[in-house]
Amino acid sequence: MFGKKKKKIEISGPSNFEHRVHTGFDPQEQKFTGLPQQWHSLLADTANRPKPMVDPSCITPIQLAPMKTIVRGNKSCKETSINGLLEDFDNISVTRSNSLRKESPPTPDQGAASRIQGHSEENGFITFSQYSSESDTTADYTTEKYRDRSLYGDDLDLYYKSSHAAKQNGHAMKMKHGDAYYPEMKSLKTDLAGFPVDYHTHLDSLRKSSEYGDLRWDYQRASSSSPLDYSFQLTPSRTAGTSRCSKESLAYSESDWGPSLDDYDRRPKSSYLHQTSPQPAMRQRSKSGSGLQEPMMPFGASAFKTHPQGHSYNSYTYPRLSEPTMCIPKVDYDRAQMVFSPPLSGSDTYPRGPTKLPQSQSKAGYSSGSHQYPSGYHKASLYHHPSLQTSSQYISTASYLSSLSISSSTYPPPSWGSSSDQQPSRVSHEQFRAALQLVVSPGDPREYLDNFIKIGEGSTGIVCIATEKHTGKQVAVKKMDLRKQQRRELLFNEVVIMRDYHHDNVVDMYNSYLVGDELWVVMEFLEGGALTDIVTHTRMNEEQIATVCLSVLKALSYLHNQGVIHRDIKSDSILLTSDGRIKLSDFGFCAQVSKEVPKRKSLVGTPYWMAPEVISRLPYGTEVDIWSLGIMVIEMIDGEPPYFNEPPLQAMRRIRDSLPPRVKDLHKVSSMLRGFLDLMLVREPSQRATAQELLGHPFLKLAGPPSCIVPLMRQYRHH
């Protein structure tokens, strides 16, 4: 009471203060202005961008890790608590699917240990999350759903027997059978069911029931004329909660393995493994690229009951996976048995090329020649690059991986197609890392790079910008954790395709490294962002459209001449420099064709941009990129691709069965541009123009210099 009054502490103001960033909010446009670079992809108005998807030829089997429980505040770890959390994710913005310009919110855990598998449907795609791993960070998960058509039926409409009526917006909806455009395609079923779990992963998880107390899966060949007929019996195990599933006895014929498009029709937040077993929904982005050669085996299948929701694209996360393993390599990506060229000479900042192998390793790489491949298995074959020659000093990735998976006595060779229950041979994390080390360069990029700033998060890892110490130049660094990849082998796409193909209109990759258990890809940083920003916020005139098309066609002509199919051409995959130059990116989805493997069948791409033959599961080649470019032209004209207001399944059905799409306002488009579009959007692939032919079209004479794109970037940033 009589004590001295304490002196008030004075805090000085900041010294050397600089106001570098001013962030505001425009009430008229309802948008933030002046955001820092790393905030753009979090708050950008790109929540409606669809995500790409892939054909699940064979999801890499993975080693199980203990499943995690979730504790959120005072909530108990019940199944309902996980499903309740999903309501919160609907309000989180999801950015476009471009892997170099993407952010996504952190992923939640997967739920209680009593669950076997969770799957959700996001943007019409049912995705599965089977296991938890040691880390809480995001991981890539390829929602691959289809197998080679010769194995599982002649069309996409035989995946399941119809068992559930479709619901849309809370009302039951019956769809009429439509006549398919292709004679090979039958009418679509009216009922909707979920996608099957991958055969190998599903069986592997259920056979390990002794560890987790879930289900015991007794399976044997059914007595049937078809070699692909199986009889499955679910029997109860220790977990009482799953005993209700024991009543189900599932017998699948060859037609049951045929994929169905109906699984894409809805976007519910969660779906169920069985009619009585709710599962947590995990949102993840699917990734293209069909990976290594898989065994000729069907997928396991179970009908899934789903709850339809609205059509808005919601946030998604990635499942945490423990160490995945992989099958014998195939020629679906890179060039099967690629010949690695020595480092390029010149003044490149980053030396390119792999390290030379020791003599013993070089010989080991070709030790798999005596292995007997199963029937129908495509043995890796060399794609003859005009500028590359075979050298015994450099070993091929596919050959090396094959030797790893076959020579080890721990992993006996597979006997797929026989009556045995033997699993595909596996490659450990250490073996895979050793194989990847042959492709990347030695050293640590942190020795010459600093100031790493995260600017995005893609389907396989995060993207940072970094500064070169000795020049001050900014580069993009894509960091991918090997242990958190659902399909580790797809990482070779990112490294080898970008390393071997250099063009003025292709994003340049400087180098790649293994830093611990992460693959770091150092590449060109394009300050202008993605074409998606321009398409969604501004309107392009025909000069600007022609300028973009000219650059993209030059890149495609170069890639197609090398036998590379991009398979995901869209505005998200087109990046711009600050001065308006246009470059093609995202090569994780590509495939290689050659004389030995002239066509592809995998369902790969983003639904609205897919060519009809891809959706129809017909063999396809480089022509699919031309169709996708035509859709991207419509995107530049109308601001979005055709059928963008429809769910992916309905859009895919219309692409497959209807006449080619057209722009909304034809009267606003010149006859020259209409003619240009008509050459690309041709249903018959053989009648579709090639990239080289399109480069001579009169419309491209309207193309201006790269500087004509700069005002669009300024206009977008002003918004």
Curated annotation (Swiss-Prot):
Binding-site positions, ATP: I455, G456, E457, G458, S459, T460, G461, I462, V463, K478
Matching Gene3D superfamilies: CRIB domain, Phosphorylase Kinase, domain 1, Transferase(Phosphotransferase) domain 1
Alphabetic keyword roster: Apoptosis, ATP-binding, Cytoplasm, Kinase, Mitochondrion, Nucleotide-binding, Nucleus, Phosphoprotein, Serine/threonine-protein kinase, Transferase
Chief location category: mitochondrion
Location of this chain's protein in the cell: Mitochondrion; Cytoplasm; Nucleus
InterPro entries named among the record's database cross-references: CRIB_dom, CRIB_dom_sf, Kinase-like_dom_sf, PAK3-like, PAK_BD, Prot_kinase_dom, Protein_kinase_ATP_BS, STKc_PAK5
Modified residues (Phosphothreonine): T107
Residue ranges of every copy of the CRIB domain listed in the record: 11-24
Phenotype on disruption: Mice are viable and fertile, and show normal development of brain, eye, pancreas and adrenal gland.
Domain Protein kinase span(s) in chain numbering: 449-700
Post-translational modification: Autophosphorylated when activated by CDC42/p21.
Active site (catalytic residues): D568 (proton acceptor)
EC number(s) on file: 2.7.11.1
Positions of the UniProt region annotated as Disordered: 1-28, 96-118, 226-245, 253-298, 339-372
Pfam families, alphabetized: PBD, Pkinase
Quaternary organization: Interacts tightly with GTP-bound but not GDP-bound CDC42/p21 and RAC1. Interacts with MARK2, leading to inhibit MARK2 independently of kinase activity. Interacts with RHOD and RHOH.
Domain notes: An autoinhibitory domain is present in the N-terminal region of the protein.
Family: Belongs to the protein kinase superfamily. STE Ser/Thr protein kinase family. STE20 subfamily.
Protein name: Serine/threonine-protein kinase PAK 5
Source species: Mus musculus (Mouse)
This protein's encoding gene: Pak5
